[in-house]
Amino acid sequence: MLTKCASSSDPFMDWCKPSRSRNKRFDSVIKAFGFIQTFGEACIYKKVSGSSVAFLILYVDDILLIGNDIEFLDSIKGYLNKNFSTKDFGEAAYIVGIKIYRDRSRRLIGLSQRTYLDKVLKKFKMDQAKKGFLPVLQGVKLSQTQCPTTAEGREKMKVIPYASAICSIMYAILCTRPDVYLSISLVGRYQSNPRVDHWTAVKNILKYLKRTKDMFLVYGGDKELVVNGYVDASF
């Protein structure tokens, strides 16, 4: 885990430049060393040399280096130190709100967002709520017919942070909690005109996340990748 502080040539002037200019400079410097920007994600770069592979992930001024060859990674860090003033924090343990756990004996990496979920629960005043067993309660049916049809009903819902709660949960889904993807997709349909019933469903998802906030996403372990697909007939 590295943090990029400034240009070694002229730190003050370099960091007075707009963020876009700094990003363009970093992009050109890292590509000159053989890194290729990935097509799907502009902040991820890849470099391959023989059997050695390295990924560089840039988030604002923080850099996460991943690779299968320590000497290869050291050469990359040396190159970065020549072009930028950097600080090496060692093995990555926490980045963008995600806690990283390792079990090297079993070749496992776990990603947890407990701290982030605690903040979300507190933000929406659900930190003292009861824990939910499932993200979607059995028998609950949501539909457009439940949406407010009067100005009074819509005005009442304006004080409810409906869309904000959904966006907060979506970040967890994208990073470590795909298990609530279906439930959030159901309540997300009513963001333009939600009713109390829809908000109750959102709070139920938060209750479930409160009960399961210690769960984390685990990668690795099995040598063979087995993919299971599921179809939701109601979609």
Where would I find each of the regions flagged by the language model?
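Long, low-complexity, charge-biased intrinsically disordered regions
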Residues: 1-235
